[in-house]
């Protein structure tokens, strides 16, 4: 029992495999689990159990994802692997599986392929901060120069999308070789694990970030003032803190004079908790659902941004028909819908259900946002798409 307790204090990091179809993402996932279980203890997983990924629904979107776990001496990893290309696209855009780092798998026999590029671009758009490269199938390439050439190509491709291509770790290995217990290739899996430990920094915990709470409801309490309720997304709210009310209207600041949870008064509310915050001197009609309460200066309201969007297919309950420029749906951010105009990339006339697309959105009223914020696209309360803010313009 004491051992189990000790394990739990290890830092937790979320990673995943990305890359072109058949380059060996799932085989690598199995090889990591198996090799690390052999060396450091833990549960081995075979290819079949990972490849048979269960379907999940995230905001109405069907995604097949396999979740595996493994340990290094320093950390505990949660790792996602998807069977199909479409699953990766959906996963990255919805943030169903947030990654602190990605393992880009490239077959040495093929070099970078179209989906290699697309996954790198998506990684950039959705904010995967770190990428480590695993060059797979190196046991099938005899020519040392060819391996160097592929490595150079991959590094250049990553640099093209603003990843530090020259500096990031590239490990040349064979996932199948490691899975079959061949020592020289098992050593490469250990090398990959060491790269994960050293190259991907420990993610900041939600509680250590600046305070932010999306406002879900507003009440006025006779003689005490206005209370806003919501679930704290990040940081800590203490009684006496100055807070900003951001989005929809002009930003205002006030002081939090009380924090309560389940009708009990607290000194503070923390990330993940549902609380009510009493605001000094704020009138009931000055705040509304859809705004956020935040540490002053930590987040700003915006109306225009570039986004990466996945459009639900008909089977997922999405649209049955394409949409064109001039489409004006609602964009659902955190707790509220805001109407917006879209512009499509040059040369794109229409967007079909099931597509993923980059679009520039201009909202009719400002919303508190950072790059990486997720949203849904809705028509009359029905979700027809999912997106992520890639770049803020105004």
Swiss-Prot record:
Q: Name one GO cellular component term.
A: cytosol
Q: Which reaction does it catalyse?
A: GTP + H2O = GDP + phosphate + H(+)
User: Where in this protein does the record put region G4?
Assistant: 136-139
Q: Which top EC class is given? A: hydrolase
The EC number on file is 3.6.5.3
Annotated stretches, region: G2:
60-64
Region annotation (G3) ranges: 81-84
Metal-binding listed as a keyword: yes
Key words, A-Z: Cytoplasm, Elongation factor, GTP-binding, Hydrolase, Magnesium, Metal-binding, Nucleotide-binding, Protein biosynthesis
Sample GO molecular function, one term: translation elongation factor activity
- The residues forming a coiled coil are none
Instruction: Please give the Pfam families that the UniProt record associates with this protein.
Output: GTP_EFTU, GTP_EFTU_D2, GTP_EFTU_D3
Q: Where does the record place the region G1? A: 19-26
Main subcellular localisation? cytoplasm
Q: Any idea which positions bind Mg(2+)? A: 26
Which subcellular locations apply to this protein?
Cytoplasm
Where do the record's region annotations for G5 lie? 174-176
General function of this protein: GTP hydrolase that promotes the GTP-dependent binding of aminoacyl-tRNA to the A-site of ribosomes during protein biosynthesis.
Q: Which family does it belong to?
A: Belongs to the TRAFAC class translation factor GTPase superfamily. Classic translation factor GTPase family. EF-Tu/EF-1A subfamily.
* Matching HAMAP family: EF_Tu_B (MF_00118_B)
Oligomeric state and partners? Monomer.
The molecule here is called: Elongation factor Tu 2
